From Swiss-Prot:
Role, per record: Peptide chain release factor 1 directs the termination of translation in response to the peptide chain termination codons UAG and UAA.
Family: Belongs to the prokaryotic/mitochondrial release factor family.
Post-translation changes: Methylated by PrmC. Methylation increases the termination efficiency of RF1.
Name of one Pfam family that matches: PCRF
Name of the protein described by the UniProt record: Peptide chain release factor 1
Residue numbers bearing the N5-methylglutamine modification: 245
Subcellular location: Cytoplasm
Keywords, comma-separated and alphabetical: Cytoplasm, Methylation, Protein biosynthesis
GO molecular function terms listed in the Swiss-Prot or TrEMBL record: translation release factor activity, codon specific
Taxonomic source organism: Polaromonas sp. (strain JS666 / ATCC BAA-500)
Gene assigned in the entry: prfA
Principal subcellular localization: cytoplasm
Length: 373
């Protein structure tokens, strides 16, 4: 482990002891907001401290086993035991080191939030819409594995199956490091390209088509409240499904336009106009916040191009090659030959690799900052 990381962990331990004292102080207990904030910080620091304690313990075990091996020159049985313990300790240390590095990465407060996932068909016509349906299935299956709640906010099915566009909301508990739906799926934003033989292809030729995905953190309710109602144009219309067949005979579908930015959100999934309006306003708020974030990120990117990318829709991030059973993430040069499993929601390896790559970037930035550059 690099010295600056160990120094950071030592400071975390000192902070944990400080939090123990603060949480028992009368003035803190009487201030509910401060008490909650410190309790959350204590919970996160405790997880880090537990892992760091395990790391130092295994490092001590490794040193002891190496000493035993040095003294066991004439005792093959003891030498074998020592070598076995050395191998096990090194494996544990490597895993704990990686876990701690991820824990030390500065937390994005949005990582714990629920998220809106927007999937849009792009180039490729009907095949692109079918692939949008496949991505919808992939993400919902991944949500099931994580026991997240999934809600369809709006959908525009294509006539041959799949979607021209579909917007989902996903919510669920955070993991031990405080990462929730948005933190897991944030790196899915961008262009997704598929190479396969379409069901409608009679000559067996491989076609290439594409979809775009945008993952937006759900903003606080306060953000939605800050939108000036005078800046909104609200239109209602009859909800309809594929082929233009009416789902109901009332104007329950809602389209909201934010006039200053031209951003539009709509919802027709619910029979209640009131609930559709509330959902559309949620999506609109998320898109406005994301527009602001994207503009700031673009300015930052002009100074430093990140490995994982900006998350812009125009970034081609991934290729799904069905004939070869191959998925390639172009941002980190990751190639996996388990495409069918991934399409069934087995996204864990992909997401972890992206988180590790982004973490390495952030750790490099931390090290640079700690060295005073």
């Amino acid at each position: 482990m690099k010295p600056f990381l160990r120094q950071t962990l030592d400071r975390q331990l000192l902070r944990l002891h400080e939090l123990d004292s603060l949480l028992s102080a009368t003035d803190v207990v009487s201030d509910l907001d401060r008490f909650r904030a410190l309790t959350r910080e204590h919970a996160e620091a405790s997880v880090v401290a537990e892992q760091y304690t395990r790391l130092t313990s295994r490092e001590a075990d490794l040193a002891s086993a190496e000493g035993m091996l040095a003294e066991a020159k004439d005792d093959p049985e003891m030498a074998a035991m020592a070598e076995e313990e050395i191998a096990a300790a090194k494996l544990d240390i490597a895993q704990l080191d990686e876990a701690l590095q991820l824990m030390l990465i500065p937390k994005d407060p949005d990582d714990a939030r629920a998220a809106f996932i927007e999937i849009r068909a792009g180039t490729g016509g009907d095949e692109s819409a079918l692939f949008a349906g496949d991505l919808f299935r992939m993400y919902t299956r991944f949500a099931e594995r994580n026991r997240w709640q999934v809600e369809i906010i709006s959908e525009s099915p294509s006539e041959l199956g799949g979607y021209k566009e579909v917007v989902l909301r996903m919510d669920g508990p955070t993991d031990a490091t405080g990462v929730g739906v948005y933190g897991k799926l944030r790196f899915e934003s961008g262009g997704h390209r598929v190479q396969r033989v379409p069901a409608t292809e009679t000559q067996g030729r491989i076609h290439t088509s594409a979809c775009t995905v945008a993952v937006l953190p759900e903003p606080d309710e306060a953000v939605a409240i800050q939108i000036n109602p005078a800046d909104l144009r609200i239109d209602t219309y009859r909800a309809s499904g594929a082929g233009g067949q009416h789902i109901n005979k009332t104007d329950s579908a809602v389209r909201i336009t934010h006039i200053p930015t031209g951003i539009v959100a709509e919802c027709q999934d619910d029979r209640s106009q009131h609930r559709n309006k509330a959902k559309a306003l949620q999506v609109l708020s998320a898109r406005i916040v994301e527009k602001d974030r994207s503009e700031r990120a673009a300015k930052d990117a002009a100074m430093r191009k990140g490995l994982v990318g900006s998350g812009d829709r125009s970034d081609r991030i991934r290729t799904y090659n069905f004939p070869q059973g191959r998925l390639t993430d172009h941002r980190i040069n990751l190639t996996l030959y388990k495409l069918l499993a991934i399409m069934e929601g087995d996204l864990g390896d992909v997401i972890t690799a992206l988180q590790v790559a982004r973490g390495a970037e952030q750790l490099a930035e931390l090290e640079t900052a700690s060295n005073g550059f």
